[in-house]
Design a protein with these regions (language model features):
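Juxtamembrane inter-helical linkers in multi-pass membrane proteins
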Residues: 24-37
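Hydrophobic cores of alpha-helical transmembrane segments in multi-pass integral membrane proteins
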Residues: 1-24, 42-72, 81-142
Length: 142
């Protein structure tokens, strides 16, 4: 849950950055552009710093869940939809770690849009799998 909270905060930072960008484009005041860009850069920095513990906690949750599954069912991984979507979420956020090697992630606007869209995987993992898809972690048929 800690990872989901941090990822939600990153997503909210992205929405705020997009709102600031929209406000900047509507006003077009030259002196105000530098202030807005500075705020967007600060939001980007905060989001990038929060991405590390968020992804760590997400990975730790997947790892501990696998250990618990081995104790309970005798296997670490069963390719259950919840497990698969947790892995997809982990990989999607893992891509954002490569901001130095992937030039497109250096642009704050792209980074924030990516973080907003990446949060859809969190929503699918948390709600979609539980209430829509089947599997061990599903409440859709209950």
């Amino acid at each position: 849950m800690m990872s989901y909270a941090l990822l939600a905060f990153i997503m909210l930072n992205g929405i705020l950055a997009l709102c600031l960008r929209k406000k900047e484009s509507e006003n077009n005041v030259s002196g105000n552009d530098a202030i807005q860009d500075n705020r967007i850069e600060q939001l980007t920095l905060v989001s990038r710093l929060l991405l590390y513990p968020a992804t760590f906690f997400l990975g730790a949750g997947i790892f501990l869940g696998a250990v618990w599954a081995n104790v309970s069912w005798g296997r670490y991984w069963a390719w259950d939809p919840k497990e698969v979507w947790a892995l997809i979420t982990f990989l999607v956020y893992g891509v954002a770690f490569h901001s130095q090697s992937l030039r497109i992630f250096r642009k704050p606007l792209f980074f924030h849009i990516y973080m907003i869209l990446a949060f859809l995987t969190v929503l699918m993992t948390y709600f979609g799998v539980n209430y829509v898809l089947g599997g061990m972690h599903s409440y859709a048929n209950a």
